[in-house]
Amino acid sequence: MQTPKLVILLALAMSAAMVNLSQAQNSPQDYVSPHNAARAAVGVGAVSWSTKLQAFAQNYANQRINDCKLQHSGGPYGENIFWGSAGADWKASDAVNSWVSEKKDYDYGSNTCAAGKVCGHYTQVVWRASTSIGCARVVCNNNRGVFITCNYEPRGNIVGQKPY
């Protein structure tokens, strides 16, 4: 009787460790650190975590859980959204790195993106006036993938202004 109990306890402990590992890769610091690395690279000050923005992001992510659509919330904050296909364990760093990868398509001198390219996610990440972020992640229902959103305050990407 002791052996089955031990096996069950070990299985439960391993499951808890795997859940904690997944949560650890999507903690506030897992969003803040890559944002701040990108910001430091262009001489912009750090952002800090906002539980208010996190709550807004989580509420919106929960609304996307059934369809996983890349659709903006239309809320009062700056916003970046990310979708990752089913079958992969998309993490905070995957989303932020995706947005930061647009740097190569941004020309600071002209404050424009390369022809046919997108760079607004990157400019929001490094927007000097944005000082707070809050993010959320959901695994969408029916094998639709992962939806990640980050919100920024004050919002960035003001037309006619450079990010830094």
UniProtKB/Swiss-Prot annotation:
GO biological process: defense response
Xref: Pfam families: CAP
Transmembrane segments: none
Signal sequence, start to end: 1-24
Domain of life per record: Eukaryota
Gene Ontology CC entries for this record: extracellular region
SCP domain location: 34-152
Job description of the protein: Probably involved in the defense reaction of plants against pathogens.
Protein name: Pathogenesis-related protein PRB1-3
